[in-house]
Amino acid sequence: MAKRERTTKVDAPKRRVYLQRADELMDSVADAEARSHAIAAGVAAVQAAIAVADAVTVARLGLRSTGPDHEAAVALLGRCGAKGAEDHAKQLKRVLAVKNLLEYEDRLPTEHEARDVVERAKRLYAWARPFLEP
């Protein structure tokens, strides 16, 4: 049996709420990087990627993921109709794959893992940001 996609309807103008979250979290990424705090940068990058994906899906579909594992966020982003959305949904999936490591596991991320999640989140944010402007 296929999993039911867990989403909620959100009015498109509310994209600004999710965009502001993403903007502030990306600022936190830069601050953490400047202090060589790789874990903090990675955690903020994951949260920024989720927020910017929500902003895109709210803007394009009027929907936001509410699933606990963020699978719906990846699926929604992939089908939102924006140019490059499928590729960027894959980026989001890769970012989310590192979330548990950064936040919960009993080992620290490698330098490569920490840097990779930040770079992927930055690419997702840079792709999404221009078409989310008011």
Q: What positions do the PLM features span?
A:
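Terminal alpha-helical segments
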Residues: 1-134
